[in-house]
Structure formats: C-alpha cells, structure tokens
C-alpha cells in the first residue's frame, strides 16, 4: 500500500519472459548438484591411472631370456662362431611386402608366349633335338671334311665365297652336305611302280635366314651332276664301241641292206637338276650363284623367268650343248613342259627353294604337277625353307612321311645380333601419324655416325651410304610411303609387284651387293683428292641457292617394299629394317627381320606400333629375341 492507502502493482522487470525461462533452465537446482557429486565418486578411473593386478605376479615362461645385445667389444676374443641354429622365419605379411612369397612368384612367372600361342603358325622343334644336332655338328670345322670332288671343293673359296678371309661351313652346311652326299647314288636306276608312293630320297633343309642354305644344297647337286657326267661318258664310250662292232658285222654280212641309223637323243632342253624358286628376283640371285661355280667346275647352267624375253628363254633351254642345272619359277616351267614333253625326262635332282611358299595354295598345284612328271627319273627331292609352317608340316607328314628333316639348332629364332626397337606412334610428336614417325626414325638413323670401323684409312674415303628397308603390308601403300619420304628430303624408292622388271633389277642391285673393301690405290687417290679439295684459309665457300627443299638427308637410301623382298633376297648391304606395319604372323616377322644379321653381321630393326596394333605380340617377339628362343 502506498501512502494514500491504495494497493500498488509490482513493477515489471526489464527482462522478457523468454530470457527468464532460459536462465532458470541453465542454473541447476540444489538436488541436481548433490546427485551429480555422489555419482562422480562411483565412476571408474581411467586405465592409465590404475595399475594392473598382475604386476607382482611372476612370468609364466621361465625359460624365456631377455635378448642380449652385443656391445661394441663383444666380437673380441671369440673362440667359436655364434651362429643361430635355425634362421629366423619371416611372417607372411613381411613376405608379401617384399614380394618374395611363392604366390607372388607364381603370378610373376607367366609363360613367355601367351599371345603368340593364340595364333600359332609354326611347327615346333623339340629343344632336345636341337641340342643333339648342335653336338653332332661341332666337330666339322672345314669344307675339306666333306667328300666332295676336288674341283668342287677348290671352287668354294674362289667362286662361291670370294673375298672372305676365313671360310668355314655354317651349321646347315655341316648338317646337310654330308647327308646329301652320303645318300647320293648317281647310277641308281628308276623304279617303275604303279603305286603313288615316292621311290626317291626326300630331304627337308630348315635353317634360319641368312645361314647359307643355297650353298648347302648347291654343292651336293653340282657334285652329283659331275659324277653323273663322268658315268655317262663311260657308258657312251662303251655304247660307241658296241655300235662300231655291230656296224662292221652288218657291213660284212649285208653290205647293201644297211638301215639308216636314228640320230641320238640330244641333251638340249633336258636338264639334270632343276631349282624352283617362287619369284623372278630369286631366280636372278640363285642363278648368279650357280653360274659362278660353273666357271671352274665346268657345267652348263641357265635361268628362266618372266623378266626374260621368249627368244632368250628358248636359247637357254634348247642350247645345242645341252643344259645341266636350270633355275626357274614353277608356272613358267610347267607351261613350257606342256609343249616339250622331254623337258623333264632326265631330271635326277629337284630342289624347292622357299618350300613354304612353293607348297602353299597359290603354288601347290603347279609344284605338285612338276614333281609327278619328274618322278620316274628323280633320285632326290630337296625342300629348303627358313620356316616350317604348320600347314607345310601337315602336308609333309601326309605326302612324304619318310622325309629326312635336317634342322639347325636356331630354327625359327631371330639372331640375337639383331636388335629390335619399338616406336609408339600415338605419343607426341607423331600423334598417330605413322609416315611421320617413319621419316623421323630414318632421319635419326641417317644422321647418326657409322658404328662399324672400316679401317685406319676410313677417314680419307667417302662416308658409306646407309641402306634401309621399310616393309609395308599392302602393295598400294608402298608408293604412298615412298612419296611422303621423298617430300621429307629422303632418297626413297618403292618396290612391289607392280614395278617394272628393269626397275626391280636396278634397285635390288644397290641393296643386295655389299661394297668391297677399298684397295690401296683407292685409298691413295682419296688422300690426293682430300688435299686438293681442302679450302683456302679465311675464305668462305660460296653458297648456291637451289630451288626446292634444301633439307636433304645425305648418304642414306631407303627402299619401301612388300613381302616381295622378304623371301630369300640376300640383302648383305642392309643394316636397318623398319616395319611400317606390325606383321600379321610370326612367319612374316622372321622373314622381314631375316634381312638383317646375315652371315654373322649385326642389324637393327624398328617396328612402328599404333593404337590398333597387337602390342602384346610385339612384346613377346622382342622378349624371345632377347632370350634367343625360337618363335612359335
């Protein structure tokens, strides 16, 4: 109540009701604080603040000793080695971390040829057989150990292998020449039978590329021809004596009833041995080898192909003096044999060089027809190849089950002296441009120095011209790639089945003939020219502005070709092969890279790999080359 005696209302607090309720909830009541203090005493203490009840108990394992760590002088004055009886075993986790576990080892050791097994094209040769052959031919070190005629043996160094300091037989020559000579029977008479079984000796010579297979079959064939020639001369001499006696008796008995004698059958167009090859280029190459031996051994040889004129073919076949050894292609020989029935009547030796090609679908009917026509007089059928495809292996097992296979230890293996590099064209700076990558590789090889040491006077001579082969899969791309390389300043030419015969001969001559070593006169002439051509001091040479591109790659020649030159062509002058496309099969790999490493020389191969190419196949081929193992 106030002084006036009236009731007064309490004054409002300055805070609102919401704030008052908030403060009441935040401030605990007295009974809540008392309860929380009581429960705090019953809480469990933190483990780190309490000791374990087992602290005072002794250890259960009494034999366990504390590991002693040797001090700095622990190794002094020791009388016995302190070596643990059993090594410490590592846990599985430690083995997995280090990668030494058996499971990891089994995962890493994958088979060598996984991708190649899916496209197996070659017939396998057991490694046990390879090792046995290697031990068998180890004792043969010279051509003098072969039972060849002296005139044939003396012609090897002078005609077959001129310019070599040391002449030793290669593995296929050590293996094949004794077998072909051992079974040789020049006086063997043909057996006439009605069945289809062959009654002549059959041989298969299989060796790696560039191993001297041509000489391996050519020397026994030449030896057999000369022995048969000597036997024929003796028979002719006896026949002439008998005819002379008969003529005298007839003259005595019936002087006026003499019948005219028939002229003797001429040897014109009747070769003793025939060598079949698949291409005209191989005809020229093998024909040169056969002709070289004829200079000293004295026999008549000839070669016929589609590159020659009909008049020249007729003069070669039907020469009055006859012909002993003929080199030809199957289709041309079969077409001539249809009009000349006596052409194949005297053949005793038939050689199928590059047999895997001559017995495929395109050549098999013609080749089989020739074999059947020469069968009555045939003594030896010799098949020669660098690869044994599965198709050829099945054909031989079916048609010639008794054939004698002479295979070298390194069959189907690319020589280890050949290095294979891989260029990914999808990366910068090519970005999928295969032709640009090819040109860049050629420029890199052309600008690099020559790794071979030519001799002490090589600096006075002109630099060697590098020869490079580029293989493409399609015939149409050969001209396109060659034109692109020419636009980049590279001396490139294309060679395919569409090229003319004259162009093929000119181009192949540059890539197959290795330049001979310089003579002393050439070295002296080069020294004189170097002195005269030395520039005058302090005088700059005059520059000539020539039209066109001035950026040219010197001392480098490139041949863009197909598989036309991958079979049997003896490219001794080539040291680099570029595979513009990845080959379809391992057979193409072997033949294309087989243009390198011939006769013990080194080589380098480069394969261009794109996005759609089988990189796993290239990888396995490269690993097989590094290990020296045979491809499959």
From Swiss-Prot:
CDD domains: SF2_C_DEAD. GO terms for molecular function: ATP binding; ATP hydrolysis activity; RNA binding; RNA helicase activity. Residues 460-632 form the Helicase C-terminal domain. Residues 1-37 form a transit peptide. Keywords: ATP-binding, Helicase, Hydrolase, Mitochondrion, Nucleotide-binding, RNA-binding, Transit peptide. Residues 49-111 are annotated as: Disordered. Residues 194-406 form the Helicase ATP-binding domain. Gene3D superfamilies: P-loop containing nucleotide triphosphate hydrolases. It catalyses: ATP + H2O = ADP + phosphate + H(+). InterPro entries: DEAD/DEAH_box_helicase_dom, Helicase_ATP-bd, Helicase_C-like, P-loop_NTPase. The keyword Transferase does not apply. A motif (Q motif) lies at residues 141-174. Its EC number is 3.6.4.13. Residues 97-111 have a biased composition (Basic and acidic residues). A motif (DEAD box) lies at residues 353-356. It is found in: Mitochondrion. One of its GO terms (cellular component) is mitochondrion. The keyword Membrane does not apply. It holds the Pfam family DEAD. SMART domains: DEXDc (SM00487), HELICc (SM00490). The Q motif is unique to and characteristic of the DEAD box family of RNA helicases and controls ATP binding and hydrolysis. PANTHER family: DEAD-BOX ATP-DEPENDENT RNA HELICASE 50. ATP-binding RNA helicase involved in mitochondrial RNA metabolism. Required for maintenance of mitochondrial DNA. Belongs to the DEAD box helicase family. MRH4 subfamily. This is ATP-dependent RNA helicase mrh4, mitochondrial. It comes from Aspergillus clavatus (strain ATCC 1007 / CBS 513.65 / DSM 816 / NCTC 3887 / NRRL 1 / QM 1276 / 107).
């Amino acid at each position: 109540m106030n002084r006036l005696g009236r009731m007064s209302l309490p004054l409002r607090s300055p805070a609102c009701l919401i704030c008052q309720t908030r403060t009441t909830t935040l401030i605990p009541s007295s009974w809540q604080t008392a309860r929380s203090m009581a429960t705090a005493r019953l809480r469990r203490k933190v483990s780190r603040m309490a000791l374990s009840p087992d602290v005072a108990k002794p250890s259960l394992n009494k034999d366990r000793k504390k590991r002693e760590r040797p001090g700095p002088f622990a190794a002094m004055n020791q009388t016995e080695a302190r070596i643990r009886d059993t090594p410490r075993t590592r846990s599985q986790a430690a083995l997995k971390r280090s990668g030494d576990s058996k499971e990891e080892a089994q995962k890493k050791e994958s088979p060598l040829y996984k991708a190649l097994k899916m496209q197996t094209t070659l017939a396998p040769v057991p490694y046990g057989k390879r090792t046995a052959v290697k031990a068998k031919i180890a004792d043969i070190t010279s051509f003098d150990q072969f039972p060849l005629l002296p005139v044939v043996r003396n012609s090897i160094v002078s005609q077959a292998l001129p310019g070599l300091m040391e002449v030793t037989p290669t593995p296929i020559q050590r293996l094949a020449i004794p077998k072909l000579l051992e079974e040789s029977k020049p006086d063997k008479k043909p057996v006439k039978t009605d069945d289809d079984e062959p009654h002549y000796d059959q041989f298969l010579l299989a060796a790696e590329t560039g191993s001297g297979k041509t000489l391996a079959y050519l020397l026994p064939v030449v030896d057999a021809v000369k022995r048969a020639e000597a036997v024929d001369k003796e028979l002719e001499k006896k026949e002439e004596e008998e005819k002379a006696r008969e003529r005298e008796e007839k003259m005595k008995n019936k002087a006026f009833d003499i019948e005219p004698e028939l002229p003797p059958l001429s040897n014109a167009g009747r070769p003793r041995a025939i060598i079949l090859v698949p291409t005209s280029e191989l005809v020229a190459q093998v024909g040169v080898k056969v002709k070289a031996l004829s200079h000293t051994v004295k026999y008549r040889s000839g070669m016929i192909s589609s590159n020659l004129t009909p008049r020249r073919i007729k003069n070669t076949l039907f020469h009055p003096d006859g012909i002993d050894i003929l080199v030809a292609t199957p289709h041309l020989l079969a077409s001539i044999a249809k009009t000349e029935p006596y052409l194949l009547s005297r053949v005793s030796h038939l050689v199928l060089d590059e047999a895997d090609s001559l017995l495929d679908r395109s050549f098999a009917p013609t080749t089989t027809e020739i074999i059947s026509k020469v069968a009555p007089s045939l003594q030896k059928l010799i098949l020669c190849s660098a690869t044994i495809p599965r198709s050829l292996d099945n054909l031989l097992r079916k048609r010639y089950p008794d054939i004698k296979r002479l295979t070298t230890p390194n069959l189907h293996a690319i020589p280890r002296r050949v290095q294979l590099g891989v260029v990914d064209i999808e990366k910068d700076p090519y970005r999928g441009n295969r032709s640009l990558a090819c040109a860049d590789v050629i420029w890199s090889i052309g600008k690099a120095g020559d790794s071979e040491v030519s001799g002490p006077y090589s600096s006075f001579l002109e630099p060697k011209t590098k020869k490079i082969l580029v293989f493409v899969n399609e015939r149409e791309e050969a001209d396109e790639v060659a034109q692109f390389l020419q636009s980049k300043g590279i001396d490139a030419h294309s060679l395919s089945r569409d090229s003319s015969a004259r162009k093929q001969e000119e181009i192949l001559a540059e890539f197959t003939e290795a330049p001979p070593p310089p003579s002393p006169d050439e070295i002296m002439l080069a020294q004189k020219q170097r002195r005269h051509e030395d520039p005058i001091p302090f005088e700059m040479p005059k520059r000539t502005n020539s039209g066109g591109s001035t950026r040219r790659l010197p001392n480098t020649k490139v041949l863009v070709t197909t598989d036309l030159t991958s079979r049997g062509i003896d490219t001794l002058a080539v040291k680099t092969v570029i595979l513009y496309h990845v080959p379809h099969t391992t057979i193409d790999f072997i033949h294309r890279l087989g243009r390198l490493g011939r006769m013990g020389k080194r080589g380098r191969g480069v394969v261009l790999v794109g996005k759609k190419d089988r990189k796993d196949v290239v990888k396995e081929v490269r690993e097989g080359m590094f290990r020296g193992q045979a491809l499959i």
